[in-house]
């Protein structure tokens, strides 16, 4: 799982 997408999800 990429952390970049995770960051956008927890914006």
From Swiss-Prot:
Location of the protein in the cell: Cytoplasm
Induction, per UniProt: By salt stress.
Major localization class: cytoplasm
GO molecular function: GTP binding; translation elongation factor activity
GO CC terms of this entry: cytoplasm
Family that this chain belongs to: Belongs to the GTP-binding elongation factor family. EF-G/EF-2 subfamily.
Name of the molecule in the record: Elongation factor G
Organism in which the protein naturally occurs: Bacillus cereus
Gene name of the encoded protein: fusA
């Amino acid at each position: 799982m990429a952390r970049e997408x995770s960051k956008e999800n927890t914006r």
